[in-house]
Amino acid sequence: MKEFIKYLEKNILKEEDIGFKEAMKLSKCEEVGDIKQLCHSADNIRDFFCGVEVDLCTIMNAKSGRCTEDCKFCAQSGHYKTNVENYELVSKEEALKLARENENEGVNRFSLVTSGKGIRGKDFEKVLDIYKELNKENRIDLCASLGILEYEDLIRLKQCGVTMYHHNLETSREYYKEICTTHSYDERIDTINAVKKAGLQVCSGGIIGLGESFEDRVRLAFQLKELEAKSIPINVLNPVKGTPLESAPKLSQNEILKTIAIFRFVNSKAFIRLAGGRNLIDGFGENCFYAGANATITGNYLTTSGNKICDDKKMINKLKLKIRKNVHKEKKMF
C-alpha cells in the first residue's frame, strides 16, 4: 500500500488527477504505517501546490434557530427540541465590531452565517447593508453563508464586497436523503453553480460522522472537485442532544486524518479547511495540518465553542507554517 500511495503522490505532483477507484483504494488503509504514509504524501501535495500558508476565517452566527429545514445533525432546526439560542438578525454595529476585532487579530476572512433555508426579503436587504459597511470599514476578505440563493441575489452580494460564498453539500448525493428531506441535493448544487456564475469563489464541504460510508466521503470529494470548490470545510459531527443524530458514534482519529488526506489527494489545490468539531480532534486538529489541511475556522462556531484565535496562531507558528496575508482587492466605496 505504501508504494501505491507514493505512486499516486508522484502522479498528482505532475498534475495528473487521481481517479475514483484509486481514491477508494486509499480509503482501505488500515495499518498505522500506511496511514502515516497517506498523511505524509497528502502533506507533500499540500506543500507543493499551496505552500506553507494557512488561511484563517471566522464566522458570526448572525441569525440563529427556528430553521424550517430538517437536517438531522443541526441544532438550529425547528423540527427538534434543542437548547440552541434563537434570535433575529444581528445589528450592523455588532457585525462591524466582531469583524474589526478579527481583522486586528490577523484573520483573513469574515463571514455572516444565517439560519434558514435561504435569507429573504427585509433580512436580505439588511444583510446587504451590513456587507456594504463591512466592505467600507474593513480590509478583511468578506464571505457569506446565507443558504439557498438565486443568481441575482449573489450578484448583489458581490457588489457589496463579498468575494466567497459558503454552501455545504454536507455529504454525497446518494446519502443526502438520509439527513435531509425538506430540500434536495440539486437545490444545493444549483446554488453553487449560481455562485460560480456570479463570479464568486466557492466554499463548500461537508460533515463526516453522519453515518455515511467512506465511499460517500470520496464521492463528496469528487463532487466538490467538479464544482471547483476553492475552500472545502470538513466538519466532524458534534452530536447535539435533541437531534436524530444525538447518539452518533464518535469517529476515530485515524479515520478523520484519512478523510482529510484523501480530500487533499482529490482536491490538490484547494483550501482544505478544518471546521466544526475541531474540539473532537486531538490538539484541536494539529495533526491534520500534517495530513493535507491548510485552512481552519478559528474562534467560535455557530452553536459550539471553538479554539481561540491566539491559540491557533501559536499552533500555526509551532508547525512552522505561516498565516496567509490578507489579499483584499481594491474596494468599491459606497
Swiss-Prot record:
Residues 49-278 form the Radical SAM core domain. [4Fe-4S] cluster binds at residues 67, 71, 74. Binds 1 [4Fe-4S] cluster. The cluster is coordinated with 3 cysteines and an exchangeable S-adenosyl-L-methionine. Binds 1 [2Fe-2S] cluster. The cluster is coordinated with 3 cysteines and 1 arginine. It holds the Pfam family Radical_SAM. Gene3D superfamilies: Aldolase class I. Catalyzes the conversion of dethiobiotin (DTB) to biotin by the insertion of a sulfur atom into dethiobiotin via a radical-based mechanism. HAMAP family: BioB (MF_01694). This is Biotin synthase. It comes from Clostridium kluyveri (strain NBRC 12016). The gene is bioB.
